[in-house]
Structure formats: C-alpha cells, structure tokens
Design a protein with these regions (language model features):
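Hinge/capping helix and adjacent helix->loop/strand transition within the periplasmic-binding protein
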Residues: 85-90, 105-192, 241, 246, ...
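N-terminal twin-arginine translocation
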Residues: 1-10, 15-29
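An extracytoplasmic/periplasmic, membrane-proximal ligand-sensing/linker region
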Residues: 32-34, 176-177, 217, 240, ...
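N-terminal (or domain-start) structured segment
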Residues: 26-115, 155-157, 180-203, 296, ...
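A ligand-binding cleft/hinge motif common to bilobed small-molecule-binding domains
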Residues: 100-109, 175-177, 204-236
Length: 325
C-alpha cells in the first residue's frame, strides 16, 4: 500500500483533534526513565533538527527526557545495529528515513533485516522533492523533457548530491518509469550539485523543494514537476510528475522505529504521543519551515509504508546497478 499526500492530510486532520481528547493512556509505568532516540547521521541536518524538536516536545509533555544520540556511518546501519543491541523495552528508539529504506537493498547489513527486526512506531514528516532543470534547457514541461531525452539518449547529465542517496535514486526511478537514458553525474554535496546545474554542466536534478525553491523563484532554475502525489503549496503552479509518469511518487521520509519485541502498548503510546506532537501548531510550523509535511499515521500505516518503500527502492537499486565500494 502506497500512501498519497491526501491520506496523510486526512490523518493530519485526525491528529489535530488530539488536544481535545482526554489524556493519552500511559503504557503501564512507561516511561520511568529517559528515552534515547538514535540517529544515523551527523548533527545539524534537517532530519536531526526535526527529531530534536520532537524530542524536546515529548520531554515536556511526557515528563521524562527524550535524548537524541547521533551514531553516523554506513548510511544509518551503525545506528540501527546500536538500537538492535539494546533491550526491546521502548527506551531505545531509532530515527528511520529514506536512507534506511534504500540501504536495505543498496548496502544491506548481514546482522539485521530492517523489516524483520525493526518495529515501526510512528511517522514524523515527508520532505517533497522537485525536478528542476537549467533555465536554458529546451524542455519546459515533463512531457517535453521525456521527448527530448528519448530523442537524445545519453546526452543529458543528471546531477545529485551523491551516489546512492535519494537525490540520485529519485532520478533513477524517473529514468526507469519514463524509459529515458539520462547520465548520472554525481556531485559532492548540495552546493556542488547545484553549482553544476546552474553552470549547465548538468541539466537536471531531483532535489528537496526547500533546497531549490529560492533558485526557482529567482528564475535561475526551472521547475518541471514535483515528486509528490499532489501539488505542493509552495509551488502551486507546478504539476506533479505522476501526472505524466503514472505512479511516480517520491519524498524524503522521516519516522521512528524500535527493536522487534518492544511491547505493543509502549509502541501505541509512543505513536499517540508523537501524533499529538505533530498536531501542535508550533511543531507543525517548525516542520513546514524545514521543508517537511507532518506525517501523523497509525503504527500499522507506517509499517505498511516502510515495506512499500523498501520494495520500491529495491527495484530502483536493481535497475540502476549501483554498488557502493
């Protein structure tokens, strides 16, 4: 089951009602001590900021500290291993995101299986992407881009912030579904990739809207389509790619997981508390400012979403024939 933005917006409406409900039922005496949330990436990035924001809210509302711990390396696998070594008691949680879903196939860890060993707890947010081209590129729409690419196979360079991440595989998914031959020329980080695009060393990129919006608004880059299932508030005149490539949908995901065996009542309690946090106007405003659409869903929905994402990116990894050294 793939969740569209409409379904998430419906869930958001439900979550918005949480403040009017009675106090969320506590799972036995949980939490009786601080809770650790392990993040697989360095401090300071948008996912880190979002998780810390939510951890602060939870600490205030629950009455126990939620402590964020960064364990970067191996595309999130080091953090996952650290969480799986901890007791499955709800006191060690894992920040989950698109890198985890991609790495399940791209860089699998022999010590765990993401879907088998990690229990989905809650969604946090989705970061929409946009397909942008150099303004001198002849195509002004997604259909024109596809037609041009098919007439000029191998002559369009697609940049990204690095091999194997979502800016890369968003483009590979597009290539696979649109049937076009575009050459991936990775940059080393956001700045280099955008510089290559602005200088016309690359002609197309799939990038988070929050990173690209200023260039689009200034006319330095042209947006052809957003990667989400429905149009985006910040770019209301830009159509979805899925309008022309049926089924195409991508955005960066962020959520929380726990080790397999974590008590069900603890998982349900955490899910309810996180969803209540996402319904808080101050939290919602901060998330939107960081480029995220709040993602309040049930534990079961987030689990289905995890499985769908892992399966989707497994197909793309196979198509792209990417192997990390």
């Amino acid at each position: 089951m793939t969740f569209s933005r409409r379904q998430f917006l419906h869930s958001a409406t439900i979550a918005a009602a949480f403040p009017a409900l009675p106090r969320i039922a506590r799972a036995a005496d949980y939490p009786a001590r601080p809770v650790r949330i392990v993040i697989g990436f360095n401090a300071g990035g948008a996912p880190d900021v979002v998780v810390r924001l939510l951890a602060q809210w939870l600490s205030q509302k629950v009455g126990q500290n939620f402590i964020v711990e960064n364990r970067p390396g191996a595309g999130g696998n080091i953090a996952t291993e650290a969480v799986l070594r901890a007791p499955a008691d709800g006191y060690t949680l894992l920040e989950l995101g698109s890198p985890n879903f991609i790495n399940a196939t791209l860089s699998p860890d022999p010590n765990f299986d993401l879907i088998r060993d990690i229990v989905p707890v809650a969604g946090i947010g989705r970061n929409p992407f946009v397909m942008v081209v150099n303004p001198d590129f002849p195509a002004k729409t997604v259909p024109e881009f596809i037609a041009y690419a098919k007439s000029n196979p191998g002559k369009i360079n697609m940049t990204s912030t690095g091999t194997g991440n979502l800016t890369h595989f968003s483009g590979e998914l597009f290539k696979m579904m649109a049937g076009v031959d575009v050459v991936h020329v990775p940059g080393h980080g956001e700045m280099e990739a955008q510089t290559d695009l602005l200088a016309d060393r690359a002609q197309v990129m799939f990038d988070p809207i929050v990173s690209t919006l200023g260039y689009v608004q200034a006319g330095k880059l042209r947006a052809l389509g957003v990667t989400t299932a429905t149009r985006i508030e910040t770019l209301p005149d830009i159509p979805t790619i899925g309008q022309f490539v049926p089924g195409y949908e991508v955005d960066a995901q962020l959520g929380i997981g726990a080790p397999k065996g974590t008590p069900k009542d603890v998982v349900e309690y955490l899910n309810a508390q996180i969803n209540a946090g996402l319904a808080d106007p101050a939290i919602k405003q901060r998330l939107v400012g960081l480029g995220f659409v709040p993602m309040p869903v049930s534990q079961a929905q987030f689990g289905e979403h995890m499985t769908d994402e892992v399966e989707k990116w497994a197909k793309v990894v196979k198509f792209a024939r990417v192997k990390l050294e």
